[in-house]
């Protein structure tokens, strides 16, 4: 969800955003209390943001509180919408749109266009059947000069290796299927699973192999997939631990799990506080810290847990957060102040060597053989 992170509403003008839907309350019988941390079960906690509202899509009513677990340091809403009513928060969600190929790097500037050509050449060398154009034939060599851009290119193909013949990939929470389409072009026997019926219809309309279903009860066969990816999904789940255990069950022995999610400990969260784009209440029910995510994966049975650099994503998060802080419309073309742009660039550089300091956490793990 990072490059072309989402097709946010009303793009273009920097006019004032609509007011959050606080006049209408979330149905009281549609809330549930959270007595313990959804990841580690800890009960000691502290309040981080007591009065959050939906300032992304402006469709979810209510005011929400985010707490931080004192044991694993993840964040979670309490109370939160019930599984039966959470759909109220997705009335205007971006996955309802028809699937489109992901835009990996901006081509709006001269530099962006040149980097996109290098990136295409780099990925074509990684995946011989990909055929991205325009592409520079020396992209695989020259991309070493642009490590943050190379890291973003790797993130956008989810750090996947060239597939063995017949390798099966499942993208869970695939939306309208953009990455399913990309994985097919990479050479995987790819399919998607999506809980949003409107998004499934959009994917099927695009001819993509996407079925309706959700974690943790997928109904799929055990030991079935070589790769499972979960991009910007775990933060939406009521039962994140059960979801990780289900993914472990679905993977073949030796199979790879790839996950991306906002980082509760991100510098942008420190900088912007309740305006940080990664919060997105009440759709984001849980926000993991590096410590919480590693512990949850270990407890679910995974091994070879490795955090990856998210690449040059910080400016996107900072710009989106700055829009929220300034009450601008979602997607508005608003300039990021120089000091914030500098902070974002430094964060991207730092995340190349220490991946857990980025706006996103990106991690790969394996099911032991």
Segment roles from a protein language model:
Residues 3, 12, 21-38, 45, ...:
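Conserved SAM-binding loop
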Residues 57-58, 161, 200-201, 277, ...:
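Short secondary-structure boundary/capping segments
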Residues 73-186:
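Extended interfacial segments that mediate partner engagement and assembly in macromolecular machines
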Residues 12-117:
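N-terminal juxtadomain amphipathic helix
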Residues 80, 98-101, 265, 272, ...:
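Short amphipathic alpha-helical interaction/hinge segments
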Residues 272-281, 320-328:
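Short glycine/proline- and charge-enriched loop/turn segments
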Residues 2-8, 12, 20-39, 47, ...:
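A C-terminal cap/extension of S-adenosyl-L-methionine-dependent methyltransferases
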